[in-house]
């Protein structure tokens, strides 16, 4: 056992040979490296599998022995300061390692097919290997300095992966936005780390917690300064886990390849913030104000993420806002002191959301056969519909992931989300109302995504759109660059009826029609039966087996992973593996956690949350399920048009909700006008001051010296007699001035 732990330090470095060898190979032997590209995929999967098996073994040992292992090496810089680095293995480390490796392996298998057409295939796997190394290094770190080092590496890798198709301006802007937003959080984290070191004199977690708690209990430190340092530490997870108000980078991160979206939004980058708060919870828990701030930020993010997901048309952005909302639930649980519930939801959500993102990638892959390599079209749910018969396996996997996220039993997220909802009842009635209401919103927007994607008929082939016949369509090259291609003259490029009149999604049809104003301004999308294009020949198709296999494995995880945390302890049967793993665990809401849930209490608590979820599903079916005709997607606004004017206020409310959601709560616009524009103006003024004033003074002195020298040289004429004459003249002038001032005094 002890011998096994001694080799745990190697965990972060096992995936590292792949990016190193790829970099060296592409530099020195590019042709051979590219010809053996499938070998690099196999090697990446094999190395991650080793870590997964090792992490599973460590977890099994910890379930039975409940031990924590830490090994530290000391590097003495001088007599007063020494830097210690090492590894820290506890249940949280084991759980995160298993999560990172299992999802990472499945994403790598998926990416082998999904990215096979891309010229950046090897670059993609090099980034992925480095990303996995960074995350594994983060979760095994034994001190805050190591955490910060790997934290920055995770941010750098996410920058590279989000901007993978860097030739597309929108992707380049997205990765810059993610990078800059996370720099704000990272700066706060760095200040918090330095403040804690100034207070405690240690970076090591165990020493830090012990010293910190003693200082607080004995009132030997300024509580205000302590709270400030703790809050600065929390700013880092706010940005990394996309919590309000530093969440603005998350939807734009969808510009990267879909496997990256699955990895970032499931088990890696966004989970890093939750991991760090969980790791530092013994420090936060002694400061009640910080715990309340954590829970407050969490509940705001829960509601905001759900409302922003209501009207998204891009399937990946809808799932991104869903991730934001679910991360809010985890942060809420940590702020309430429910450590187990937060980590349980982290696990169940990771597998469910990875399934949904890989499913969306399969859908996008199938749509590209029709609309080309253009995210504006292949990810637009309004162009989808009726995919059930074309991609049946993807449909089943996506439906299971959707039901899980909605909290429908017995799927994974039901068990974890229900725990958080029940804990919120004990913590605050207001927080509980918001949390339960958001559970209904989650069910609504997730089934909205499902219905728009799979139900009805394929909307790409409907004909009721406006546009110019002489248009061009944009596709994405293998490097992600948008290329303009002229269409066949027999066809017209027609923009889709959209709720935002300034942005259009396009596809091919035979004719174009003008849309009346009353239809153009509709709140919800309505595609009416105008007939299909008789010249259409292409349909979506099911993805290859290497794409479907990871989805089916994640489907099994979604079905059964919730069993590890089922809180039933009756008649000698104990299914709660998670509580055994997290023993002793922090739980402020359940002091007596030996057997606080029985069958009756569980059914009573679960009935209400499941009822709310089914209500949200019903509303989604009412608005988006086509039931008047097989070719008619009925929405709420169609019903409003047949009712009297008393519905105008309700219609205005719906329009407000839509505009709020579609425009991202106007938060991006606020940041752009109040912060970005101000910073740009300041940068321009600073640039002007630097170029014109500072450089002007420096250059002016230089130019003046040059001209004085030239004049002096001209007057002197390079003759000694001239130099003596000038010298004596200057001395005479000096004496005259001195004599004048001397006699002035008398």
UniProtKB/Swiss-Prot annotation:
A Pfam family recorded for this sequence:
Proton_antipo_M
State any GO CC term.
chloroplast thylakoid membrane
The record's function comment reads:
NDH shuttles electrons from NAD(P)H:plastoquinone, via FMN and iron-sulfur (Fe-S) centers, to quinones in the photosynthetic chain and possibly in a chloroplast respiratory chain. The immediate electron acceptor for the enzyme in this species is believed to be plastoquinone. Couples the redox reaction to proton translocation, and thus conserves the redox energy in a proton gradient.
Q: How does it sit in the membrane?
A: Multi-pass membrane protein
The molecular function terms in GO held by this entry are: NADH dehydrogenase (ubiquinone) activity; quinone binding
Which residue windows are transmembrane per the record?
A: 9-29, 40-60, 89-109, 125-145, 147-167, 185-205, 221-241, 258-278, 280-300, 327-347, 354-374, 396-416, 425-445, 547-567, 608-628, 723-743
Q: Which InterPro entries match?
A: NADH_UbQ_OxRdtase_chlpt_su5_C, NADHpl_OxRdtase_5_subgr, ND/Mrp_TM, NU5C-like, Proton_antipo_N
Q: Which gene is the coding source of this polypeptide chain? A: ndhF
Q: What class of enzyme is it?
A: translocase
Per the record, the similarity remark reads:
Belongs to the complex I subunit 5 family.
Lineage of the organism: Eukaryota, Viridiplantae, Streptophyta, Embryophyta, Tracheophyta
Under the heading Gene3D superfamilies, the entry gives:
1.20.5.2700
Protein's UniProt name: NAD(P)H-quinone oxidoreductase subunit 5, chloroplastic
Record note on quaternary structure? NDH is composed of at least 16 different subunits, 5 of which are encoded in the nucleus.
